[in-house]
């Protein structure tokens, strides 16, 4: 899985500070795609300018990057890791698949800026995220969740 390896080569800086980078990912997601903020009711009362410094946003961002790191390290053998994530996001949180595509774009930009992910790495990340998101989509369908 060359694409996974290429992305993992730049994962170290992201992993070194999940909270800071995760906060940056979520804050940028909410800025570039404001409609996504409504999917996070626990952040509803936070002023847009305060999102970046909010401990809850930072903690959730850290969780996102931690889970993504686990999926990357599985190098495609991620079904056991992905199933519970798909299940909670489909049945409990009701997150449409398109939102994973949006956050994947943002993660790519943040990795470019903070971890030196070059053009080839960006392509590898898009390929990896396409695999993960396609597998999530299959899980969603299995669970009967359609957007």
Curated annotation (Swiss-Prot):
O2 binds at residue 60. SUPFAM superfamilies: Globin-like. It is found in: Cytoplasm, Sarcoplasm. GO terms for molecular function: heme binding; metal ion binding; nitrite reductase activity; oxygen binding; oxygen carrier activity; peroxidase activity. Its main location: cytoplasm. Disulfide bonds: none annotated. GO terms for cellular component: extracellular exosome; sarcoplasm. Nitrite binds at residue 60. Gene3D superfamilies: 6.10.140.2100, 6.10.140.2110. Heme b binds at residue 89. GO terms for biological process: removal of superoxide radicals. It catalyses: Fe(III)-heme b-[protein] + nitric oxide + H2O = Fe(II)-heme b-[protein] + nitrite + 2 H(+); H2O2 + AH2 = A + 2 H2O. Keywords: Cytoplasm, Heme, Iron, Metal-binding, Muscle protein, Oxidoreductase, Oxygen transport, Transport. InterPro entries: Globin, Globin-like_sf, Myoglobin. Residues 2-141 form the Globin domain. Its EC number is 1.7.-.-, 1.11.1.-. Monomeric. Belongs to the globin family. Monomeric heme protein which primary function is to store oxygen and facilitate its diffusion within muscle tissues. Reversibly binds oxygen through a pentacoordinated heme iron and enables its timely and efficient release as needed during periods of heightened demand. Depending on the oxidative conditions of tissues and cells, and in addition to its ability to bind oxygen, it also has a nitrite reductase activity whereby it regulates the production of bioactive nitric oxide. This is Myoglobin. It comes from Chionodraco rastrospinosus. The gene is mb.
């Amino acid at each position: 899985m060359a694409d996974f390896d290429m992305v993992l080569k730049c994962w170290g800086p992201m992993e070194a500070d999940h909270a800071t980078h995760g906060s940056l990912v979520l804050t940028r997601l909410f800025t570039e795609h404001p409609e996504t903020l409504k999917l996070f009711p626990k952040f509803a009362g936070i002023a847009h300018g305060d999102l970046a410094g909010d401990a809850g946003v930072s903690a959730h961002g850290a969780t996102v990057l931690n889970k993504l790191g686990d999926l990357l390290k599985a190098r495609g053998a991620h079904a056991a890791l992905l199933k519970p994530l798909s299940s909670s996001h489909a049945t409990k949180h009701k997150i449409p698949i398109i939102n994973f595509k949006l956050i994947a774009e943002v993660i790519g930009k943040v990795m470019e800026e903070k971890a030196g992910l070059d053009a080839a790495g960006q392509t590898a990340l898009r390929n990896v995220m396409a695999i993960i998101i396609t597998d999530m989509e299959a899980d969603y369908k299995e669970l009967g969740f359609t957007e």
